[in-house]
Regions:
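Bacterial Sec-dependent N-terminal signal peptides
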Residues: 1-29
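Long, repeat-rich segments with strong aromatic
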Residues: 240-253
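A generic structural micro-environment signature
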Residues: 7, 12-15, 55-57, 65, ...
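Extracellular glycan-targeting catalytic surfaces
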Residues: 20-220, 232, 236
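Alpha-helix initiation and capping sites
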Residues: 228-232, 248
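RNA pseudouridine synthases
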Residues: 129, 225-228
């Protein structure tokens, strides 16, 4: 699954440099004549997003042997302020990533998405520490961050049902990191079988999926304005949410 994901991103990146709506002689391409892509069913052996169980086993063996560079890398993780089990989540009711010039006066919290960025980093790093050390305090801390956002955040800020600034689309960058943390924590105290886990999956899907899918379809009605980084933010959000929720339709998108 990991290699499929890396391959997909590599191909997408390559195509971004060579894609064109015309062939060499100038004749337009009729994309409607192309065959529909084959739908593939992936067997998901969780965890299977950025890291697999085999990856964790490999790293734990290296750490047990104090092998380098793994030992130094883990020491760096241990020293991170985001990997401290005393870390406290700071969820917001409505996420905002707004342009300062246009929105600072009306929305003093115009960049409160940074709360999510920090908490996503902490949830992921704490999940790694739990998985690599088997110490409960790290699993508890990571889980509490994810639960706090699922319980307290209502989504991305909108007015009249629409985003008010295209920069809000980039909040999707955090979806992948959040989903990775949750994917790692599936096995923590059977969290993946709990109502808390289901609530988190529902929250991350309702917050990010529709926005990401709509952007990939319409590109905010200005397709020539957006570069590939905007697409990748939405693609990784959809793929990671699909893996987390075992949703083959999302994965195939």
């Amino acid at each position: 699954m990991k290699m499929d994901f890396i391959y997909t991103l590599a191909v997408t990146a390559a195509l971004s440099f060579c894609s064109c709506t015309e062939i060499e002689d100038g004749a337009p391409i009729n994309f409607d004549e192309w065959e529909a892509p084959e739908k593939i069913e992936f067997t998901l052996n969780h965890p299977c997003m950025l890291h697999s169980e085999a990856d964790f086993t490999y790293v734990k063996e290296k750490l047990a042997a104090s092998a380098q560079p793994w030992a130094d890398a883990y020491a760096s993780l241990e020293s991170s302020k985001f990997a401290n089990p005393a870390y406290q989540a700071d969820p917001v009711e409505w996420l905002k990533r707004l342009d300062k010039t246009n929105w600072e006066n009306k929305h003093p919290d115009y960049v409160n998405y940074t709360n999510l960025a920090n908490d996503a980093a902490a949830a992921y790093q704490l999940a790694l520490r739990w998985k690599l050390s088997d110490k409960k305090e790290y699993g508890d801390a990571a889980k509490s961050i994810l639960n706090a956002w699922a319980k307290n955040c209502k989504g991305i800020y909108r007015e009249n049902g629409s985003l008010i600034d295209p920069n809000e689309l980039l909040i999707a960058i955090q979806a992948y990191q959040l989903a990775n943390a949750a994917e790692i924590l599936r096995g923590y105290d059977k969290w993946g079988e709990t109502e808390e886990f289901k609530a988190f999956v529902q929250w991350i899907e309702s917050t990010f999926y529709a926005m990401a899918d709509d952007f990939l379809v319409r590109h905010n009605n200005t397709a020539d304005h957006y570069w590939l980084n905007w697409d990748l933010a939405q693609m990784t959000a959809i793929l990671s949410i699909g893996i987390l929720s075992d949703n083959q339709e999302m994965i195939n998108k």
